[in-house]
Swiss-Prot record:
Record protein name field: NAD(P)H-quinone oxidoreductase chain 4
Disulfide cross-links: none
EC number of this enzyme: 7.1.1.-
Catalytic activity: a plastoquinone + NADH + (n+1) H(+)(in) = a plastoquinol + NAD(+) + n H(+)(out); a plastoquinone + NADPH + (n+1) H(+)(in) = a plastoquinol + NADP(+) + n H(+)(out)
Domain of life from the UniProt record: Bacteria
Recorded name of the encoding gene: ndhD
Primary role: NDH-1 shuttles electrons from NAD(P)H, via FMN and iron-sulfur (Fe-S) centers, to quinones in the respiratory chain. The immediate electron acceptor for the enzyme in this species is believed to be plastoquinone. Couples the redox reaction to proton translocation (for every two electrons transferred, four hydrogen ions are translocated across the cytoplasmic membrane), and thus conserves the redox energy in a proton gradient.
TM region positions: 24-44, 56-76, 106-126, 132-152, 156-176, 188-208, 232-252, 263-283, 297-317, 326-346, 352-372, 396-416, 437-457, 484-504
Family: Belongs to the complex I subunit 4 family.
């Protein structure tokens, strides 16, 4: 059966070469190419330090990135709210399983982000000398798998691609992690694999709902008239599963441990891509496919988002371990995604999308710098890092730029995304004014804490009490050209989006507006309460056109 599938896919690819580029199977290639290429790595010689493997993996990652860019340029219409670049091949018809991929405004920016971050993660992994063949094999498997998560249009296939990420991440943590790597890897697999059962149960329930012949395609599920109780049950299960990945407090405890043991390239993939899978899935399934349940649970998302922002910011402030400090900072920033998804405004939901893209870039940059700093100082304790600013001036400049981006400095992407979320939620008349004021005021506390713990962190690392073992170490070198290049590649879109957010927002505005209208119609089923003001038309504000 699988051979027939790949034969069909190959014939279809050849058949489209004579047609327009919009008919080219861009997404299937971007998924299958890195995965297929990964299986060529075992044939590379074991001699040396893996130089050939590194260049091969980088070439594959760059080609994959160019393929996704080609998909966006040649086949994606930003004004079309529907799924585009659609490819559908019947795979296992008796099980209702179809190779169905496509992209709309919600998935396309994250597909581009995935291929971009992965290419930089491969470059960040250049110093890896231990088992380089296995390391880059796993990275390329993750590349194709993560793109598939955002591209598939079949819920059962989504579950399979979601699970595809578990083993590579587990091995990357367990083999190349720190002293407690086994504990961190085991905790990751227990949390993510355990919660994934809810995705499978929801997929089977939704696919078999009201029919004997299962159909798991998103388009079919979106048109199903699911009962309210059925939607609520599925919503709760999916919220738990996606809440682990986002992560939502209190389902977050695996993340600081994973980040505490991971290497820099794995950091970049965790913070830059893996967390975004949770936010994307909440939009795709909870908000889009289960609108009636979403209308009832949206206030809970707002509250959970505020808890994320405040709790994680306070915890980050108290951390003395550099990796864990940045990890909790990531959890705090993902709280804005929850608030945006819980809002019923186009502006707020657009802000959530932009926050995912923005944090993907900023989180990857900060964690790469954490790894680069650890490689030099051999410590993660802030108390032992003081006084290296004089010897690492370029590194200090890179840290400063990325920290300013993380604290949402105007002119950088984080500022625009957080402003959109705040404005969208506060101006959303679906919620009562007291609820909006209280939630926005509490979230503002987290915003105030962010520059405090980030700037104090910078001071402690570079200009704190001097550690003679570091300041007198002749091997303590400044940033290398490769490291400067990686940060420059990340800062360029961070600043570009901050100055002109329409670079990203235009790609998903049509899809987001359609999703919000769908959710607003579901608000009619929710009675007026101290939280809901009733069925008032939310202001469908568009993204700023700076």
């Amino acid at each position: 059966m699988s051979s027939l599938f790949f034969t069909h896919f190959a014939l279809k690819t050849i058949g489209t070469l004579g047609g327009g580029l919009s008919d080219f199977p861009w997404l299937s290639i971007s998924i299958l190419f890195p995965i297929a290429s990964a299986f060529l790595i075992p044939f590379f010689p074991d001699k040396g330090e893996g130089k050939e493997v590194r260049w091969f993996a980088l070439s594959v990652a760059l080609i994959t990135f160019l393929v996704t860019v080609g998909a966006y340029i040649n086949g994606f219409d930003i004004n079309n709210e529907n799924v585009q670049l659609k490819e559908s091949i019947s795979w296992l018809p008796k099980l209702g399983l179809t190779w169905s991929v496509g992209a709309d405004g919600i998935s396309m920016p994250l597909i581009l982000l995935t291929s971009f971050i992965t290419a930089l993660a491969v470059l960040a992994a250049w110093p890896v000398k231990f088992k380089p063949k296995l390391f880059f094999f796993l990275i390329l498997i993750m590349d194709g798998g993560q793109i598939a998560v955002f591209a598939v249009q079949d819920m059962l296939l989504f579950f399979l691609t979601w699970e595809l990420e578990l083993l590579p991440v587990y091995l990357l943590l367990a083999i190349w992690g720190g002293k407690n790597r086994q504990y961190a890897a085991t905790k990751f697999i227990i949390y993510t694999a355990g919660s994934s059962i809810f995705i499978l149960l929801a997929a089977l329930a939704m696919g078999f709902y009201g029919t004997e012949v299962p159909n798991f395609e998103f388009a079919h599920l979106a048109n199903q008239n699911f009962s309210q109780n059925f939607q609520i049950l599925c919503y709760i299960g999916l919220l738990i599963a996606f809440g682990v990945k986002l992560p939502i407090v209190p389902l977050h405890t695996w993340l600081p441990d994973a980040h505490g043991e991971a290497t820099a390239p794995v950091h970049m993939l965790l913070a830059g891509i893996l967390l975004k899978m949770g936010g994307y899935a909440l939009l795709r399934f909870n908000a889009q496919l289960l609108p009636v349940a979403h209308a009832q649970f949206a206030p809970l998302l707002i509250v959970l988002g505020v808890v994320n922002i405040i709790y994680a910011a306070l915890t980050s402030f108290a951390q003395r371990n550099l990796k864990r400090k940045i990890a909790y900072s990531s959890i705090s920033h993902m709280g804005f995604v929850l608030i945006g998804i819980g809002s019923f405004s186009s502006l707020g939901t657009s802000g959530a999308m932009l926050q995912m893209v923005s944090h993907g870039l900023i989180g990857a940059s900060l964690f790469f710098l954490v790894g680069a700093t650890y490689d030099r100082t051999k410590t993660l304790k802030l108390d032992e890092m003081g006084g290296v600013g004089q010897k690492m001036r370029i590194m200090f400049a890179l840290w400063t730029a990325c920290s300013l981006a993380s604290l949402a400095l105007p002119g950088m992407s984080g500022f625009v995304s957080e402003l959109m979320v705040f404005t969208g939620f506060v101006t959303d008349e679906v919620y009562t004014l007291p609820f909006r004021v209280v939630m926005a005021s509490l979230a503002a506390v987290g915003v105030i804490l962010t520059p405090i713990y980030l700037l104090s962190m910078l001071r402690e690392i570079f200009f704190g009490k001097e550690n003679p073992k570091l300041t007198e170490d002749r091997n303590l070198i400044d940033a290398e050209p490769r490291e400067v290049y990686i940060i420059a590649c990340l800062l360029l879109p961070i600043i570009g989006i901050g100055l002109y957010p329409r670079l990203v927002t235009e790609s998903y505005l049509a899809t987001i507006s359609n999703l919000v209208d769908r959710d607003l119609n579901a608000v009619k089923s929710v009675p007026k309460t101290n939280i809901f003001a009733g069925n008032k038309k939310s202001q469908i504000l568009k993204a700023p056109t700076i």
